Amino acid sequence: MLPDIEICRATPLAPIDTIAQKAGLHANEYESHGQHKAKVSLHCLERLANKPKGKFILVTAITPTPLGEGKTVTTIGLAQGLAKLNHSVMACIRQPSMGPIFGVKGGAAGGGYSQVAPMEELNLHLTGDIHAVTAAHNLAAAAIDARIYHEQRLGYADFERRTGMPALRIDPKQVIWKRVMDHNDRALRMVTVGRNEPGKNINGYEREDGFDISAASELMAILALASDLRDLRRRIGNVVLAYDLDGNPVTTEDLKVAGAMAVSMKEAIEPTLMQTLEGVPTLIHAGPFANIAHGNSSIIADEIATRLADYTVTEGGFGSDMGFEKACNIKAKASGKTPDCAVIVATLRGLKANSGLYDLRPGQAVPDALFAPDSAALQAGFANLKWHIDNVNQYGVPAVVAINRFPQDCAEELEQLVKLIEALPNRVSVAISEGFAKGGEGTKLLAEKVVEQCQHPTKFTPLYDSGIPLDEKLKAVAVKGYGAAEIALSDKAAQQLAKLQTQGFDHLAVCLAKTPLSISTDPAIKGAPRDFIVPIRELRLCAGAEFVYALCGSVMTMPGLPEKPSFMALDIDQHGNIVGLS
């Protein structure tokens, strides 16, 4: 098969006007950005307000290998399969971060004959939404240090007299707003800002700081969770940046930077319209990671798509313990929209990897041995798929297992896996998906199974009620969402929890950040572990996103580059064509 980028370039694409019309948008409801992408105006929702919503399908997966198991391929392939069955359909996916593109995982446009196109435009910058988030985030960071500098330079009374503004008296040791950038750079995890030459302070006041990747910014979560421009502005104004010398929260509104941050993101709130290789309209919007953020595309994109199409296919990052959990307990709470069907993507290689018999590590190629017949490893790793099926079932959402087929897969093992699934006591539909090799033709059976499941009523049940205390919410996700025995708060996290509860933040949701490579917080533990401890080392307040962010185990909010990063394969030829992007 040709490389993804060559398949994409060899496929004729429709003008974006044609795709917009196919989706049901009017000419004044979108603005073209080149030939193959457009920004969709939120004004279209005024026209569509009384139109019934279509079915909402959420694609999730087993616990993945470091290179992923084809969730985006399946999302796009399923959308194309539904179109082959003459259904009105749209797909919604996240905007890829350049961190993984240049790091380990490569692009995030799907692959083979189930891609969003042009894939190089999607993977590299798109319409600049991530850059807008980065700029707005770092504006707040600059505003904090500027305010500390001027208040301390002048003294609080003189500052108030000269500016007519109250002194915020920010405690430099309690600034909780880091800086961000859209690259993997471990050297920036811990930095010192405001350093000066001896005897000078023109660069500000020295303090410890750090960088997160832009996908982990609270503003990225806000972009994905806001319902409209007014809600975006409200949420940005609620962001807590620091605490003052008395321990009171200091918000963006206090700093009078919230309006400028919202202005920086005024175009980012509009989803970007593109197309699959088979012309299915696709909305790309927001890019929070699922391991260190809430891992789903935007509520706004879902709202537009479900008003326009009979079926909307979207995905939650990583396994069902990650993006799916957060879709059900964070996103659904904000949107009021719950899935009509879940698709659980499984692969032979992924299940064998979950047997614990193979050593797969980020940054290393998948060993060929993983594709060789190994019935014992498949049987052992099947426990992971069963866990994810049971996990989805507890939310009351009908499920279909999509076995994403690789060219190297053994036909006998595929048959063995289908039989294992069909023998489960809680009957679940299953289909082999060949979207990568065959596009929509390879996912028609999967599409039929999904349509059938969408007819069944859901009994959606989140893991916790919003009225219970934060510590009980954390425990609910760990125990019911992961199968843990208990959570273990570090001394720092326990102090932070007490402070958050005292300040009235018990009503917020919780977002646990952990490794995606295990259901537990230890990436080395494969399969379906139970009764483990979830160590929570730190809690971060995201008052604008309306959740408390719990850092579990050793997870980092700024990734690092591997020994052999993906960027080494990237180049550009004399005609401006990008080479080496996958």
UniProtKB/Swiss-Prot annotation:
ATP binds at residues 65-72. One of its GO terms (molecular function) is ATP binding. Keywords: ATP-binding, Ligase, Nucleotide-binding, One-carbon metabolism. The keyword ATP-binding applies. GO terms for biological process: tetrahydrofolate interconversion. Pathway: One-carbon metabolism; tetrahydrofolate interconversion. It catalyses: (6S)-5,6,7,8-tetrahydrofolate + formate + ATP = (6R)-10-formyltetrahydrofolate + ADP + phosphate. Signal peptide: none annotated. Pfam families: FTHFS (PF01268). It comes from the Bacteria. It is an enzyme of class 6 (ligase). Transmembrane segments: none annotated. Its EC number is 6.3.4.3. HAMAP family: FTHFS. Belongs to the formate--tetrahydrofolate ligase family. This is Formate--tetrahydrofolate ligase. The lineage of its organism: Bacteria, Pseudomonadati, Pseudomonadota, Gammaproteobacteria, Vibrionales.
